[in-house]
């Protein structure tokens, strides 16, 4: 039976569905995000449907020191975290130098630094107990550079690389690390990143559901997989096709997908 999981970015999308799926397995939860009302709604739904306990911690992890503040609050609960799911993250459409620098830096704070900090702090606790599982929600975006989302693609490349290295370092100590790299998923991400009018965003109707992606990633984590891409077609593309294409062609293709017609 699963034990307590800490899930960041749990107020919507993949994080929301991951929390429900973990609860369906009988595990308690600590969930965090900025939107307290959404967290309370999720807590109520889960505790109504499952015999588990849910602790909410409303917090903005995109500010400096957010991860340390979260860790302190988690420790104060007295709960031992057996599963860490680093899901919180956001993107942003536009030419890098035309976007607000503050937003780009916040993206790095949340998508990269928070992942590193929580992995370090909670991973250390897991090693001491001799067991633990981590799921880092990355993206197929991490397999290529991403013009018009330069920072977002780079942060996901970091997460995918980092997760694999952590798995190699900690697996013999009883701790595994899985990078979930989905393609397009029907969540709030596209609206928040102002991608809804792009060629990519216009294909949202064909995207995977957050529920199916969450279940796929969670199951991959429990199986100790290293990298999990939620569709075979995406996996084949990023692993076997894209690396063979000329670099500038790939850049032009991605720029076209992320442009507004």
Where are these regions (language model features)?
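SDR active-site lid
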Residues: 169-234
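Active-site helix of classical SDR
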Residues: 119, 155
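Conserved glycine-rich cofactor-binding loop
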Residues: 11-13
């Amino acid at each position: 039976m699963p034990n307590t999981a800490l899930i960041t970015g749990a107020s919507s999308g993949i994080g929301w569905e991951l929390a429900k799926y973990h609860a369906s397995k009988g595990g308690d939860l600590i969930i965090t995000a900025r939107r307290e009302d959404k967290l309370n709604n999720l807590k109520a739904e889960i505790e109504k449907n499952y015999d588990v306990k849910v602790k909410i911690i409303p917090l903005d992890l995109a500010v400096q020191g957010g991860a340390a503040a979260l860790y302190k609050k988690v420790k104060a609960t007295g709960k031992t975290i057996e599963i860490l799911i680093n899901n919180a993250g956001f993107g942003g459409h536009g030419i890098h130098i035309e976007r607000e620098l503050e937003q780009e830096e916040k993206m790095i704070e949340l998508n990269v630094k928070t992942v590193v900090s929580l992995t370090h702090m909670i991973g250390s606790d897991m090693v001491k107990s001799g067991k633990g599982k981590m799921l880092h929600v990355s993206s197929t975006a991490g397999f290529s550079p991403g013009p018009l989302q330069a920072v977002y693609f780079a942060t996901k490349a970091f997460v995918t690389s980092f997760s694999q290295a952590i798995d190699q370092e900690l697996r013999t100590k009883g701790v595994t690390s899985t990078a979930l790299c989905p393609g397009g998923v029907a969540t709030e991400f596209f609206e928040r990143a102002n991608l809804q009018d792009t060629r990519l965003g216009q294909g949202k109707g064909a995207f995977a559901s957050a529920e199916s992606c969450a279940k796929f990633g969670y199951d991959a984590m429990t199986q100790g997989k290293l990298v999990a891409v939620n569709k075979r077609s995406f996996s084949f593309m990023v692993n076997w096709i894209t690396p063979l294409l000329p670099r500038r062609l790939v850049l032009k293709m991605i720029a076209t997908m992320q442009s507004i017609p």
